[in-house]
Amino acid sequence: MHEKLIREINGEIADALLARKMPFAPSRKAALALLKVPGWTEGLEQMLPIRGRLECAHVLELCSCVLPRLAPRPEEGWLAFCTQYARERMYPGQGFAPDREEYEAGALFFLTVLQVMLDRERRAVPFDPLKDFQFLSSEEMGEYECGEEYRRFLAAFREEYVYEMMRLSEETTPFRTLGHIAGVHYIAMTVARGIREAGENVDLALVSAAAAAHDLGKFGCRPGERVPLLHYYYTDQWLLGRGMPAVSHIAANHSTWDLELDTLSMESLCLIYADFRSKQGRDEQGRETTILYPLEESFHIILRKLENVDQAKRRRYEFVYGKLHDFEDYMRSLGGRRPDRAAGGAEAPQGPGPDAPGRDGGQPDPAVGRAQPEADAPAEQRAEVRQHHRGRPLGQELAAAAGLSGCVRRVLHLSVRAAEDPGPGLPL
């Protein structure tokens, strides 16, 4: 029924395996031969067409007919092992996957198939700001001083299966770090684009890479280590080890506790502002979830959590909130401008075009370049995203805030809750 589509996907998987120089796939012919084992085509047929978010466990079921030919099954299971294996690739020597050599061939095969299938998912379902990334196109990143570091970031993000690891982590751990990171990237980039469109100077490549990397250090923390303190260090190490000092300077210094907000760059402010507004809580079933709050609401949530802390810490957060409120006022002042040309005389950028890369710089992202990516999707798919702004769907707000000033204004009071299986009683 989906013969052509299956051939296309098999070809993409074979090309990906060959590009990574897998020892078990020395040629495209050998890679395709792996996908001819009994059960593969039938399993892929059951997954097509893709109409919703894929589960890593379902992709593992697809791979179950191939994996025994490559490696024995890890004691903890393939999903848990591959989560730790990907962390070990990011942070060698941390002991996340001590038996990696025995299972490496199977892990690489599964992670590559998962990457291809998630690329397909991204093109099939509406954009979700708590799961997806809209990265800059090759043409766009070349405009910025940090463009070369940005290319290195996108390459590492894909080569080390960073996105796939975060999706796996959602199914193998109780944590939902992806939602927070993606949400921060969404807010930071919306703010940065609006500021640039208003004629101010901001490096979008630097903002994008720093926002997408700012909490990756959490995956480098070993059991027993203090994640709130050490994740800055591991973020710094991951970025510096891949030749991204400028990105590291922004990403690893986003704590609001020890920074002098009066001396921060525009890129740092975009990240700290976005991070302040992206909070993790619990839904009615007790599951961790990410919510993007308006600034004032986020501040009051923080204050409630700080009821039992000393006055010095409380005053620090009040100071930070005041500075970020000033930043919002600054953005509102920019919202009144409608320049024909951006800073430096160049035409004001209108956002990435339809051929811009997806969340990892791979396949083009069909949602990029639209004012509201969900607007063209069927109603039942749009409902999955569950974006709201002061009680109204975000799409209505974006329509009301069209134009250059809208890009600045539309994010100021944005409130987004996770769409992933929210449960029947979760208030939106």
Question: Where do the model's predicted regions map?
Answer:
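Short alpha-helical hairpin
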Residues: 147-167
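Periodic, rod-like helical contexts
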Residues: 374, 383-387, 391-399, 407, ...
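His-Asp-centered metal-binding catalytic motifs of divalent-metal-dependent phosphohydrolases/nucleases
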Residues: 184, 202-242, 248-258, 275
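Divalent metal-dependent phosphate-bond-processing catalytic cores, especially two-metal-ion Mg2+/Mn2+ enzymes
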Residues: 2-152, 172-202, 213, 223, ...
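Polybasic, low-complexity intrinsically disordered segments
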Residues: 403-418
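Short linear motifs in low-complexity or flexible loops
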Residues: 367, 371-379, 383, 400-402, ...
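Intrinsic-disorder-associated, low-complexity terminal segments enriched in Asp/Asn/His/Tyr and depleted
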Residues: 365, 376, 388-389, 413, ...
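Non-Sec secretion/translocation targeting segments of pathogen effectors
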Residues: 426-428
